[in-house]
């Protein structure tokens, strides 16, 4: 429903602006000449409404940006089954380039990306100090280090008809990617005497899935690295239809409905590395919980829809 509202409002705004422009009796006509170029900025409100960022590909990303409930659980911490459809959306914000090859045809390309590194830290009790002095208030820090990236590139043809207010439509190829990895650092170390050290509560409640990993030689484990989805890639076909209005010489605003009817997506190997105390060998060890060797997705349909609101300058 939110997607429909965003699309409807965007197109109505574009249509109203175009209608006002066409009713101006003495309006001048500005159209790009063959051989001219344009640079612009595009905004996709559907991607913004869906939270379609690279962080969405990680359950830790959901943990960092989610909302805590009364029981301490973060809403949205679980992976979303439809998260691969984020790849079928053009970036939330992108930069585009046009080259007017013919009077009613132009080559168009765009690129948009996002990324970041988050080092989220919290204090926990210092177990060693507490063992020596139960009244100790000493603390150490745990950290969740999230490295994520994402973006998209499009290249295709755009056709137009009209003057000041133009009908535009086109098609082309889209490549998109998103994801990352998560690393953990702990202030309290695992030892023979302290096999279940105090750890950031949010890690144990929202991230640690050791209980379902199937490891039998560790009674407790905590994650040290989570390659949860990793960087996934998608290649697809896009088509769009919309309007472009030249509100002044060499400058235009536009709105298009974008559709990605088909896309092939690739998800790399997925795994989590845990550390714990090996009760059979009497030493701290790591366990690699391999979740998936990699997956392939075929996304198709008319629901992979978005909107692009653009501002271009021709020269």
At which residue positions do the language-model features occur?
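Cleavable N-terminal export/targeting peptides
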Residues: 1-36
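Short glycine/proline- and aromatic-enriched beta-strand/turn motifs that initiate or cap beta-hairpins
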Residues: 22-110, 114, 120, 299-315
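Outer-membrane beta-barrel domain signature
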Residues: 28, 82-86, 142-146, 160, ...
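Outer-membrane beta-barrel proteins
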Residues: 48-54, 117-122, 178-184, 264-273
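Charged, glycine/proline-rich intrinsically disordered loops and linkers
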Residues: 64-74, 197-218, 278-287
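Extracytoplasmic loops and strand-loop junctions of Gram-negative outer membrane beta-barrel proteins
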Residues: 72-81, 134-141, 216-227, 288-295
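Gram-negative (and chloroplast) outer-membrane scaffold detector with strong preference
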Residues: 93-222, 230, 234-237, 245-251, ...
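Predominantly the C-terminal beta-signal and adjacent terminal strand-loop region
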Residues: 242-315
